[in-house]
Regions:
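Short coil/turn motif common to extracellular beta-sandwich-like domains
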Residues: 1, 97-102, 170-172
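Short amphipathic, basic-aromatic surface patches that mediate peripheral association
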Residues: 1-6, 107-110
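Tryptophan-paired
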Residues: 5-65, 114-199, 226-232
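Extracellular beta-sheet/turn segments enriched in Thr/Pro/Gly and aliphatic residues
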Residues: 68-99, 104-108, 192-232
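Extracytoplasmic beta-rich ectodomain segments of secreted or membrane-anchored proteins
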Residues: 99-106, 111-123
Length: 232
């Protein structure tokens, strides 16, 4: 991934050096900085583990190679084991790899005038990233709430999205989708069981969300690695 491509996908690049199980160096860069995508670190001789994480969030905790975020966004990472000695190359090229699966719900019918928020509740995946494996660490419940701009009300074919870290490269998740008005009253809710997901893929659920009758088809976007289709 080029610097320009990474800046488009990520706003933050975090670097951690771990030596003997302890974080011995930490650096955060933000897109727009002249040094973005160029990490300089005086690494002493010995064995080290280097972690690189690109995202649009904030790492709230990093321990044993597992990163926790305040929210899950498009995320790329790489873990490098490096033995530093007199013969070690001073420049190490790093290619970050996308770690998330993306879920999209497309409402083909018009958004109701009283819609204020939509909420995804995802089970069967993780909101934390094990950078060594590139996968989630343990199963937990992830909730994402999206504020709906008033300018979108009445529009059709609106897309709502959430990212998650799968526990395996390919796995199934359960998704509860809930739409609410400004007072928190539920307008409509849908549950989708066994939604097939894959890291670096977009699984897309498309259908009439707010009507009395609804039907859904599920696809995955080739803008990433591929597509997954479902019909209900």
């Amino acid at each position: 991934m080029t610097r320009a491509a990474l800046e488009d996908a990520c706003s933050v690049l975090d670097y951690f050096r771990v030596t003997d199980g302890e974080v011995t160096s930490f650096l955060t860069q933000k897109s727009g900085e002249a040094s973005f995508c160029t990490i300089a670190d005086e690494i002493p001789y010995g064995a080290h583990k280097l972690y690189f994480i690109g995202h649009k969030s904030e790492v709230t905790d990093f321990e044993n190679g597992v990163a926790s975020f305040d929210k899950v966004t498009d995320t790329f990472s790489y873990a490098l084991s490096l033995e530093v000695n007199a013969n070690t190359e001073s420049v190490q090229p790093i290619e970050l790899i996308r770690n998330v699966a993306k879920l999209e719900l497309v409402a083909v019918d018009a958004l109701p005038d009283n819609l204020a928020t939509v909420e995804f509740t995802i089970t069967g995946a993780d909101k934390n990233l094990d950078v060594d494996t590139g996968l989630g660490e343990t199963e937990n419940t992830q909730v994402k709430t999206i504020q709906v701009p008033e300018t979108n009300l009445g529009k059709t074919n609106c897309t709502f999205a959430a990212y998650t870290f799968l526990l395996e490269e390919e796995s199934s998740i359960a998704v509860d989708f809930t739409a609410k008005d400004k007072d928190g009253n539920i307008i409509v809710s849908h549950t989708f069981e066994n939604v097939e997901m894959q890291t670096n893929f977009i699984s897309r659920i498309t259908g009439k969300v707010f009507g009395d009758q609804f039907g859904f088809s599920i696809t995955a976007s080739t803008e990433w690695a591929g597509e997954i289709d479902y019909e209900f």
